[in-house]
């Protein structure tokens, strides 16, 4: 896991820092509105992805699905696409802390 001491790696007001896999994966997400839950973890558990596959997550939100996929599979390239600027910022920060 990456260690990030930058302010960009800390949740801002209105955000929370949550963990998955016994703290091995850290996720910043909005305190209100859409928040990931067990459905993202279950979805990733059902995927059959090979190492050289290219993956795109449309509407990635905080980036939970690409982060889970990267954690569970040795994937060379994952792209998360999001149009909400606030969520893009969170997703980028989540990549930094993981």
Which residues are covered by each model-predicted region?
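Short, basic/low-complexity N-terminal boundary segments at the transition from targeting/disordered tails
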Residues: 1-6
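Conserved SAM/SAH cofactor-binding pocket of Class I
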Residues: 45-98
């Amino acid at each position: 896991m990456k260690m990030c001491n930058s302010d960009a790696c800390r949740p801002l007001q209105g955000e929370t820092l949550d963990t998955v896999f016994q703290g091995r994966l850290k996720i910043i997400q909005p305190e209100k509105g859409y928040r990931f839950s067990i459905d993202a973890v279950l979805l990733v558990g059902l995927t059959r992805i090979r190492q050289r596959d290219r993956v795109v997550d449309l509407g990635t939100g905080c980036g939970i699905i690409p982060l889970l996929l990267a954690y569970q599979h040795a994937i060379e390239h994952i792209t998360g696409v999001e149009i909400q600027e606030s969520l893009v910022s969170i997703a980028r920060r989540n990549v930094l802390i993981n």
